[in-house]
């Protein structure tokens, strides 16, 4: 493997928001199920509160386990946006691959862009823009643009020999 990178959502402000959101069902369950006071002006049923808590904690767990993993070697590019997307593209299918500063594409995660196609990113604004021979495009965000540039130069030299 010539290049390997694993990214996770590590923005402090995101986890602060998720912590606040996660505190709401805990407070609701404590107040309504343990103390016996209704939680809010129009309280949910106990079952509804439990279902809401499971949903919120599942969402937080998804953010915790979500990762963008990129592996590149002389044969192919492998990208996995766990747990949602897995993609493998051989170099023979690629028309062009370059490091770009893609700017803000409406947030992080999986985004659609008119310029880059599907954008897979966790943070930042730099990525590997890939144009396929079939006309489709996608972009993989990176926090290691310099390593990726060096690797692309090595791969292109090997592929031209």
Residue ranges of model-derived segments:
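Cytosol-/stroma-facing membrane-proximal "stalk/adaptor" domains immediately downstream
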Residues: 142-161
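N-terminal membrane-targeting/pre-transmembrane regions
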Residues: 1-43, 120, 125-127, 137, ...
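Conserved beta-hairpin
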Residues: 53-98
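Hydrophobic alpha-helical transmembrane segments
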Residues: 40-52
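Short, solvent-exposed secondary-structure boundary motifs
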Residues: 51-63, 110-112, 117-120
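Non-transmembrane, membrane-adjacent beta-strand/coil modules in membrane-associated proteins
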Residues: 9, 79-142
